[in-house]
Amino acid sequence: MWLIVGLGNPGERYARTRHNIGFRSVDTLAERHGLTFRPQRANSQLAEGNIYGQRVVLAKPQTYMNLSGQAVVALCNWYKIDPARELLVIYDDLDLPFAKLRIRERGSAGTHNGMRSIVAQLGTTEFPRLRVGIGQPPGKMDAADYVLGRFTPDEEAALPDLLGRIADAVEVILREGLTTAMNRYNPL
């Protein structure tokens, strides 16, 4: 079983912001595989089903980004998830160029407050993650304003392809494992 968590902030105000690329990623996976998000459990919207023979739970924490760890820990406990082998977190990354994907088996939280919350609540950095590049803020723009801002029109036009590649990468993880997915998507 896999718990696949897309990070974001709840509410229409944040729906199309850079910080919500994780939510949009799990929405794309759900749509592709005919899964429907249902009312909350453990402060999350959930969609459950099978993807390529793997039981999956897609989750969108509704705790706001900075408290994502509360929802992730509650879900890991509820579903008896081993984070090192059965958790995948998808989130935005300022340190990667727009549309660059980076899959890792483990690693630090970096500057991402949602990941900091998850690491603090789980007490470990030993869990897989898929980082999605959103690029750096232009000029002297504040990072918080940037991540809570909307994509440019050119970026928004590129999102369907990007979200498709993210879904493809997750499917490779489920079918062939993390190493194969890292080898296939990290160099691009």
Curated annotation (Swiss-Prot):
Molecular function GO terms recorded: peptidyl-tRNA hydrolase activity; tRNA binding
GO cellular component: cytoplasm
Site (Discriminates between blocked and unblocked aminoacyl-tRNA): 9
Keyword terms, alphabetized: Cytoplasm, Hydrolase, RNA-binding, tRNA-binding
E.C. no: 3.1.1.29
Pfam assignment, any one: Pept_tRNA_hydro
Active site residues per record: 19
Sites marked Stabilizes the basic form of H active site to accept a proton: 92
InterPro entries: Pept_tRNA_hydro, Pept_tRNA_hydro_CS, Pept_tRNA_hydro_sf
One record GO biological process: protein quality control for misfolded or incompletely synthesized proteins
Catalytic activity entry: an N-acyl-L-alpha-aminoacyl-tRNA + H2O = an N-acyl-L-amino acid + a tRNA + H(+)
Binding site for tRNA: 14, 64, 66, 113
Assembly and interaction partners: Monomer.
Family, similarity comment: Belongs to the PTH family.
Function: Hydrolyzes ribosome-free peptidyl-tRNAs (with 1 or more amino acids incorporated), which drop off the ribosome during protein synthesis, or as a result of ribosome stalling. Catalyzes the release of premature peptidyl moieties from peptidyl-tRNA molecules trapped in stalled 50S ribosomal subunits, and thus maintains levels of free tRNAs and 50S ribosomes.
Descriptive protein name: Peptidyl-tRNA hydrolase
Gene name of this polypeptide: pth
